[in-house]
Each structure stands twice: as structure tokens, then as C-alpha cells.
């Protein structure tokens, strides 16, 4: 009996806070509904306007005075050493974090003005900690989409990443399970194959913007090169950001953004930067030497 009385008192005491919380949630919903609907646009132009960003409880800015325009259909490599601000730039572009100062614009409008769900429909993203699930191959690619043209879209996506021949050779094709949790005859994919499957999942969405954030970080140089050779196919007709600390990918891109300590150190093509930017050329040569040494050890 005492417990019931105590519970009743607690409910009365905390009821006002519950009511305030419900009002807050409702207020957030109304605010979200008041935001702009993002109409389908043929060209998406992103602008970083004097953007600064500092993570909570940190003294240094992760991004400092970033001014950058990303035009529709551009293939960009964003490079720099660990901690240079590459992933922070992506999170700002996705609207997952808000600038401490400055604005990120889409076609001249602050992205915070758009409904977040509408805004994110423009992006397909592959992060370095991607997940492959022990479901069927097709379910890993289409995220359980059962639309009538799903199978054709799956085959197109896996062909673009160079997995079509491998998957077609399996007895059950795209209906093959990955791993043995649900099917003893499930297939095991190598690191490179799993990486390609994650990229195929992003391509299946067929969005206007594809972001690949360190997608080859865990792969050896040979497997990495195989993925790079598919870059033109992957990025065809799309705005593509390739975030990496490995500079071998940059020659496949229209432009290279070099970040250093959260700021743009240089901007240009791979060949321009090799000739004209000491920091970039030194990074490139150090990595080239590292890869050459690795190849010699394998031999």
C-alpha cells in the first residue's frame, strides 16, 4: 500500500515536467512543419559561407573560416591528415551538426530552413564504419525495398561496383544469404567485396549527391585501386565527394580540396597541386613511398 501511495505522489510531482516535455515535443513538431519543403531540383549548388565549427568542450575549431562552393555534378576529393576536418565538413554538409558561426547554403538558402527529411533525400553516404548485414545480398542493397523495378536497380548497382560477375556466379545470385546465421550455405565476402556492396547500397538510392567518407581506409592498396577504377562509373551524373587521407584517389576527381587544421590549404586539380603546393606534393610523395615499400615487402 505504501508503494502505491509513493508512486501516486511521484506521478503528481513529476506530472508538470511530463506535460512540459509533451508541449516541447509538440512545439518541435510545429517548428519542423513550418520549415521549407525542398522541391526536386535539377541542379544542387552547396555553399559554405564563412563556416566555423567547434565541437562541444573543445577549445580549437575543427573547421575555421571555410568558404567553398560545390557545383552540381562535380567530383571532389577532400583530403588531409587525420584531424584535418574532413568528416566534420561532411557532417556540416549533411546538416547533422550546425555551424558555430557562418552558414551552409543549398541554392542560396540556409540548409537549416529545409525540412531535414526532405534535405537528406538528396544524399547517399558511405562511411568507413559501414555495416553489412547477414541477410540476402539483395536486401543489403535495396534496404528491403520491394518496388517492381528493384531487381533491375540492384543489378545495375552491383555492376557499377564490379560485383555483378561474382554474384551472378552464386547458385542463388542476389538471393544468396551473407554469412551463416540464416543459411548454412551463405557466402562470405572479402573486405573489398563488402566495401563495394556498401557502395552499391548507396548507388541504389540513386540520389543526386554521393558522399564516400574514407570508404577504402581499411583496404590494402591493390583492392583500393580496384575500387578507384570504378570511380567514374560510380559518380556518373552525380555530385560526388570522396573524403580520404589517401591521395591516390584524387586523380580521379575534377578538383581536390586540401584541408589542414580545419582550413583550406589548397584547391585545384591533382596535377596543379603536385606542381604548385608544397604541402600536398610532400603528402603525396610520402604516401607513394609508403605504398612502394609495402609492395616490396609483399614480394
Regions found by a protein language model. Give the residues of each.
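Helix-to-loop junction immediately C-terminal to a conserved catalytic motif
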Residues: 94
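Primarily ABC-family ATPase nucleotide-binding module
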Residues: 25-77, 156, 233-236
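Cytosolic ends of transmembrane helices, especially the final helix of ABC transmembrane type-1 domains
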Residues: 1-25
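ABC-fold ATPase nucleotide-binding domain signature/coupling loops
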Residues: 105, 164-197, 206-208, 290-299
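C-terminal portion of ABC ATPase nucleotide-binding domains
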Residues: 173, 229, 246, 251-299
Amino acid at each position: 500500500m505504501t508503494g502505491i501511495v509513493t508512486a501516486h505522489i511521484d506521478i503528481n510531482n513529476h506530472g508538470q515536467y511530463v506535460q512540459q516535455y509533451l508541449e516541447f515535443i509538440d512545439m518541435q513538431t510545429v517548428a519542423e512543419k513550418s520549415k521549407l519543403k525542398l522541391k526536386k531540383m535539377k541542379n544542387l549548388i552547396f555553399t559554405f559561407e564563412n563556416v566555423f565549427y567547434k565541437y562541444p568542450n573543445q577549445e580549437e575549431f575543427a573547421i575555421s573560416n571555410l568558404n567553398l562552393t560545390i557545383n552540381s555534378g562535380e567530383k571532389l576529393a577532400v583530403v588531409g591528415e587525420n584531424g584535418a576536418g574532413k568528416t566534420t565538413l561532411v557532417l556540416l554538409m549533411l546538416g547533422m551538426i550546425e555551424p558555430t558561426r557562418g552558414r551552409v547554403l543549398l541554392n542560396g538558402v540556409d540548409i537549416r530552413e529545409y525540412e531535414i527529411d526532405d534535405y537528406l533525400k538528396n544524399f547517399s553516404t558511405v562511411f568507413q564504419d559501414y555495416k553489412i548485414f547477414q541477410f540476402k545480398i539483395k536486401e543489403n542493397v535495396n534496404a528491403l525495398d520491394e518496388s517492381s523495378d528493384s531487381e533491375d536497380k540492384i543489378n545495375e548497382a552491383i555492376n557499377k561496383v564490379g560485383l555483378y560477375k561474382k554474384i551472378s556466379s552464386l547458385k542463388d545470385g542476389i538471393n544468396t544469404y551473407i554469412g551463416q546465421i540464416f543459411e548454412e550455405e551463405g557466402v562470405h565476402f572479402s573486405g573489398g567485396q563488402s566495401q563495394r556492396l556498401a557502395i552499391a547500397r548507396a548507388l541504389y538510392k540513386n540520389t543526386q549527391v554521393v558522399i564516400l567518407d574514407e570508404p577504402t581506409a581499411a583496404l590494402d592498396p591493390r583492392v583500393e585501386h580496384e575500387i578507384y577504377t570504378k570511380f567514374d562509373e560510380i559518380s556518373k551524373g552525380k555530385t560526388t565527394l570522396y573524403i580520404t587521407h589517401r591521395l591516390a584517389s584524387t586523380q580521379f576527381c575534377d578538383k581536390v580540396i586540401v584541408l589542414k587544421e580545419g582550413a583550406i590549404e589548397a584547391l585545384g586539380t591533382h596535377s596543379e597541386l603536385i606542381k604548385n603546393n608544397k604541402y600536398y606534393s610532400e603528402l603525396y610523395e610520402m604516401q607513394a613511398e609508403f605504398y612502394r615499400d609495402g609492395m616490396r615487402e609483399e614480394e
